[in-house]
Amino acid sequence: MKRIRDLWVRTNLIKKIGIGVVIGLLLGILLPDVTAIGILGQLFVGALKAIAPLLVFALVVQAISHQRSGQQTNMTLIIVLYLLGTFLAALVAVIANYLFPLTLTLNTSVNTELSPPQGIVQVFQTLLLKLVDNPINALATANYIGVLAWALIFGLALKSVPSDFKHLIKTAADVTSQIVVWIINVAPIGIMGLVFSTVSENGISILSDYALLILVLVGTMLFVALVVNPLLAFVLTHQNPYPLVFRCLKDSGLTAFFTRSSAANIPVNLQLCEDLGLSQATYLVSIPLGAMINMGGAAITINVLTLAAVNTFGIQIDFLTALLLSVVAAISACGASGVTGGSLLLIPVACSLFGISSDLAMQVVGVGFIVGVIQDSCETALNSSTDVLFTAIAEKAFWKQKKA
């Protein structure tokens, strides 16, 4: 027994989740009547639902309050690329939804009262009202729009406080993140329960939906990595971008695929920037910053799963509303940094725009965790490799302009 326990401790989370998916699948086929197994999935989703609003608030306050001013001029273009790249990734995900519309199988017996918006005007009205919600109520009711707004305000107000107090803020954010790590560490058990419930209630054919979901997610990320990002690079440098793109994917993306953490991949990216001969004064700032705000993969995940939920409930949205979703997803994705599965925890932010309740949104998050073995790895690979790519093309564009 001790050998089995030690082997389990040494096994990385990706393999554990894969094992959980397989066990849940087998139990759902062989023992569909043992419904108690499904409670494990409910507990896992419940724990995520409880900590997610506090996590978003703590991380955003910490990031804004510690943001430094006086960046050198070259950073301006890099930041613009980070934000533009994230928005374009979200927009590509919207287009992918129109080309390959997905639906999800959810338990709609739980709090299914939906209030779909009537076009862009009502969406803005709902957004503005949620912005001014009581901050305590926003945390308690999982009003993520309000949580983000108040976190931004508190972060800006705390920028001028003494460094000792900022350290306390960072400690609070670290503690909250650690709690999430503990919850994520039991993800294999929770996902086993989720897979069991899905298979036992809907049959084995339900897995074909997840296969299509994975294909759309990964396909969209590949399109951004191999078409959208190289196009941005070509527009700025007027050079063939693919040697640099493939170098970043090979040396940065491959490592990030397995670590599943942009923050953990920072040392790899710094070394790659040095190997590429980039300015140290620039990449020492841009790479850590990119790990926080360059979240194209996260924006794709948020939009694909949110729009799948929208399709599931038959909510009709116009293109302007979908465009607003891209903006919200891009902004929300910036809060996903440094947290395993962080993009999934921010799906309720986007779902709330369409009147989808928190309970149903967390079921969508549960679906995300089921496919997360592949989704999170590909997402991190895209995010982290793009940090180096945008840093490099910004510097190339800077020198090109200077020579001209």
UniProtKB/Swiss-Prot annotation:
Protein family (similarity comment): Belongs to the dicarboxylate/amino acid:cation symporter (DAACS) (TC 2.A.23) family.
Function text: Involved in the import of serine and threonine into the cell, with the concomitant import of sodium (symport system).
MF terms in GO: neutral L-amino acid:sodium symporter activity
Subcellular location: Cell membrane
Pfam families: SDF
InterPro entries xrefs: Na-dicarboxylate_symporter, Na:dicarbo_symporter_sf, Ser_Thr_transp_SstT
Lineage: Bacteria, Bacillati, Bacillota, Bacilli, Lactobacillales
Encoding gene (name): sstT
Transmembrane segments: 17-37, 44-64, 75-95, 138-158, 179-199, 212-232, 287-307, 319-339, 354-374
Gene Ontology cellular component list: plasma membrane
GO biological process: serine transport; threonine transport
Keyword Membrane assigned: yes
Protein name, per record: Serine/threonine transporter SstT
Coarse class of the protein's main subcellular location: membrane
Entry keywords, A to Z: Amino-acid transport, Cell membrane, Membrane, Symport, Transmembrane, Transmembrane helix, Transport
Coiled-coil zones: none
Catalytic activity: L-serine(in) + Na(+)(in) = L-serine(out) + Na(+)(out); L-threonine(in) + Na(+)(in) = L-threonine(out) + Na(+)(out)
Keyword Nucleotide-binding assigned: no
